[in-house]
Amino acid sequence: MATILTLAGDGIGPEIMTQAIDVLNAVNNKFALGLTLESGLIGGVAVDATGEPLPEETLQRARAADAVLLGAVGGPKWDGIERSKRPERGLLKIRSELGLFANLRVAKLYPQLVNASSIKPEIISGLDLLIVRELTGGIYFGEPRGIRTLENGEQQGYNTMVYSTSEINRIGKVAFELAQTRAQAAGTPAKVCSIDKANVLEVTELWKQTMIELQQAEYSDVALSHMYADNACMQLIKDPKQFDVMVTGNLFGDILSDEAAMLTGSIGMLPSASLDEAGKGMYEPCHGSAPDIAGQDIANPLATILSVAMMLRYTFKQEVAAQAIEQAVSDVLDDGLRTVDILDRNEAGLIQVGCQQMGQAVLAKLL
């Protein structure tokens, strides 16, 4: 029997997690998956309860679990505390401690939401791209880092961006193999676009060269292209359907995946998976804790529900159950239900619903 650790976290985390757990329990029963759910603390609520953003008990339970489902962490309540104790540090630590080096973010536009995006329908209709982000290296983890006082009394902040060939090869393999899988399913040529700033950053010069060597040695059937990060930001808006799989480092991936989220109409629609080398993973919505709307029952739970589908697909290899959730979400959108973030007030026949009503509508499609 497999175990899933649920970590609701802060802000809207508990609201969206409640709906995701209901959906998970439904597919668990419907498809006899044999999954057991546990819960734990992370983020600000963990700081309040234990003084640590990632309590040792939570970390040990996460290591023992087959997968982790996360809500969201952080909020202004904890902005003034010691940096090492802030909620976001718990998230960085659990990713690092579990070896979750590969972050997968799917930007897929549901046809029902084509008018919810700020981009013209003819540019984004049919969008389905995957961003593969290296998650445990780069500037977010590089040492040395800090804020120091110079001899003249001025303060200076500094960080270090580092990648080794082994780290680049590891994330590259994930991207190339996912491109092969997606191409086989779609009946299209496999392609990967590697994002860097090799013109000004030596660390990404190594990134680019390592990707080239990996593709030539092991993945000659996958077309590899390269693009500077600033141009990639522009191209995601100008012509997003030119991409299938994008692979990049931690910093650029963080930025590009949030940009890609808005192509879909709302970051509230984007799930994500963070995987280790064995396929064990942590699954979470791409959005943050949104403390400004917490407790108001207006958050969009669909990204978290779709994260459950990704978990079933990538960690538990339950494709039928994953597709059932995705179809249920699509059916609910067909019915015209919209949380406020994906509501087009100029479109007739839509029904504005809250977090709970949206989650329960998806659940009803699965029963």
From Swiss-Prot:
What EC identifiers does the entry list?
Answer: 1.1.1.85
Q: Which InterPro entries does the entry mention?
A: IsoCit/isopropylmalate_DH_CS (IPR019818), IsoPropMal-DH-like_dom (IPR024084), Isopropylmalate_DH (IPR004429)
Please share the entry's free-text remark on the cofactor. Binds 1 Mg(2+) or Mn(2+) ion per subunit.
Q: Which cofactor does it need?
A: Mg(2+); Mn(2+)
What is stated as this protein's family in its record?
Belongs to the isocitrate and isopropylmalate dehydrogenases family. LeuB type 1 subfamily.
Q: What does this protein do?
A: Catalyzes the oxidation of 3-carboxy-2-hydroxy-4-methylpentanoate (3-isopropylmalate) to 3-carboxy-4-methyl-2-oxopentanoate. The product decarboxylates to 4-methyl-2 oxopentanoate.
NCBIfam families in the record: leuB
User: What is this protein called in UniProt?
Assistant: 3-isopropylmalate dehydrogenase
Gene that this sequence comes from: leuB
